[in-house]
Curated annotation (Swiss-Prot):
Protein's name according to its UniProt entry: Elongation factor Ts
PANTHER family attached to this UniProt entry: ELONGATION FACTOR TS, ELONGATION FACTOR TS, MITOCHONDRIAL
SUPFAM superfamilies (alphabetical): Elongation factor Ts (EF-Ts), dimerisation domain, UBA-like
InterPro entries: EF-Ts_dimer_sf (IPR036402), Transl_elong_EFTs/EF1B (IPR001816), Transl_elong_EFTs/EF1B_dimer (IPR014039), Transl_elong_Ts_CS (IPR018101), UBA-like_sf (IPR009060)
Cited function: Associates with the EF-Tu.GDP complex and induces the exchange of GDP to GTP. It remains bound to the aminoacyl-tRNA.EF-Tu.GTP complex up to the GTP hydrolysis stage on the ribosome.
Pfam families, per database record: EF_TS
Region called Involved in Mg(2+) ion dislocation from EF-Tu, residue ranges: 80-83
UniProt keyword annotation of Cytoplasm present: yes
Cellular component, GO, one term: cytoplasm
Assigned protein family: Belongs to the EF-Ts family.
Alphabetized GO MF terms: translation elongation factor activity
Localization terms from the record: Cytoplasm
Length: 293
């Protein structure tokens, strides 16, 4: 059997970006044949990626990029918070955000097919899955193309905001983006709040008002008042400015001779149901999997 040297392991790792121990195992199995070891490793990493594909990705990061006339937010998901802090994972997220801004893909499928480092984005993603050992998915992205100004704000990589605005002061854009991250409005103005949210709030208000025992006309006014209050609370322009609650965002913008055209807010894992396995079930699953090997 051929001797497996450290330089051989390093060479294979450079070619495949696989973990050191996996490289050594592949070289041992291939009896030192570099080409065969590379093939074995790619098959193994491919299998690893396939097994990971069914696992829930509710952790991750939001990455942003702003270019000359376009900016983007991307949510990249993984399975654990540990991987969300991985340098390679974060570098991939930033690269994907730049691709979205510069290449303008129609959707995640089109983004995944874009070329990247001699491969496609999806091939790079799968290689990262094999290297890290967790499922990784590009969940969503948003792209703003405009001749106006763009501002972004990231809060701990888990909350991301992009804002399109006009006005001379760049600090205004930064302040609005930070405010959106903190207060999480659902729309720019009250008349843009989704109808289903308004209807849901109205039903809740009707139930509460009905319990008051007041006359029908009073109940109707109470319901309308509750809905109007809700609309102000969830629309950006009507919210009290987080850095000065004596004025609304609309008043702050007017004072700065600025305006916001639109914004987008991403929160990592929002709407994704996390898998909840108890410890006993997890151990049982691992034992069952071991018996099948």
């Amino acid at each position: 059997m051929a001797a497996i040297t450290a330089s051989m392991v390093a060479e294979l790792r450079a070619k495949t970006d696989a973990p050191m121990m996996e490289c050594k195992k592949a070289l041992t199995e291939a009896d030192g044949d570099m080409a065969k070891a590379e093939e074995l490793l790619r098959v193994k990493l491919g299998n690893k990626a396939s097994k990971a594909a069914s696992r829930v990705t509710a952790e991750g990061v939001v990455a942003s990029f702003v270019g000359a006339n376009a900016g983007a937010l991307v949510e990249l998901n993984c399975e654990t918070d540990f991987v969300a802090k991985n340098d390679d994972f974060n570098a991939f997220a930033k690269t994907v955000a730049e691709l979205v801004a510069t290449q303008n893909p129609a959707d995640v499928a089109a983004l995944s097919a874009l070329p990247l480092d001699g491969k496609t984005v999806d091939e790079v993603r799968l290689a990262l899955v094999g290297k890290i050992g967790e499922n990784i998915s590009i969940r969503r992205f948003v792209r703003f193309e405009t001749s106006n100004k763009l501002a972004t704000y990231l809060h701990g990589s888990r909350i991301g905001v992009i804002v399109e605005y006009t006005g001379a002061q760049e600090q205004v854009g930064k302040d609005v983006a930070m405010h959106v991250a903190a207060m999480k409005p659902v729309s720019l103005s009250a008349d843009e709040v989704p109808a289903d949210l308004i209807e849901k709030e109205r039903r809740v208000a009707e139930q509460k008002a009905a319990e008051s025992g007041k006359p029908a006309e009073i109940v109707a006014k109470m319901v309308d008042g509750s809905v109007q209050k809700f609309l102000k609370e969830v629309s950006l322009l009507n919210q009290p400015f987080v850095k000065n609650d004596k004025q609304t965002i609309e008043q702050m913008l007017k004072a700065a001779d600025a305006a916001v055209q639109k914004f987008a807010l991403f929160v990592v894992g929002e709407g994704i149901e996390k898998r909840q396995d108890d410890f006993a079930a997890e151990v049982a699953a691992q034992v069952a999997a071991a018996k099948q090997q």
